[in-house]
Regions:
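Core beta-strand elements of the Rossmann-like FAD/NAD(P) dinucleotide-binding domain
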Residues: 2-4
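N-terminal Rossmann-like FAD-binding beta1-loop-alpha1 element of flavoenzymes
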Residues: 6-31
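Anionic group-transfer/hydrolysis microenvironments
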Residues: 7, 35, 55
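Gly/Ser/Thr-rich beta-alpha loop segments that engage phosphate groups in nucleotides
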Residues: 12, 17, 41-42, 51, ...
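Glycine-rich FAD pyrophosphate-binding loop
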Residues: 24-46
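Short acidic-hydrophobic surface loop/beta-edge motif
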Residues: 43-47, 91-94
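N-terminal FAD cofactor-binding segment of flavoenzymes
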Residues: 52-88
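Conserved small/polar residues in nucleotide/adenosyl-binding loops
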Residues: 96-98
């Protein structure tokens, strides 16, 4: 039987960050997820030929260091880089005419 230092239920952003930080300190971690893909609500799905992003689309303060964004702090600690796309202003899409 395998032994783990920590067992995490759920592979949302919180579970993945917690597991990553524990693993970084040398802990043996097991993460359980009920769905077919990790990420919790931060994922995408296809329906009727369209792709929908159901997770957050704006990560305020994640691209500059130092940051107060908790995810940005964890990514820095783990030395992980993410590709960022800067917003070029705020746009509102109205679907009332449909």
């Amino acid at each position: 039987m395998k032994k783990y230092d920590a067992i995490i239920i759920g592979s949302g952003i919180g579970g993945l960050c917690c597991g990553s930080l524990l693993a970084l300190t040398g802990k043996k971690v097991l993460i359980f997820e009920a769905h077919s893909q990790p990420g919790g609500v931060a994922h995408s799905f296809n329906m009727k030929g369209y792709k929908f992003e159901s997770g957050p689309s704006l990560w305020s303060g994640i691209g500059k260091w130092p940051t107060t964004n908790p995810l940005g702090q964890i990514l820095k600690l783990l030395d992980e880089k993410v590709e960022l796309i800067k917003y070029q202003g705020w746009h509102v899409l109205s679907l009332i005419h449909i």
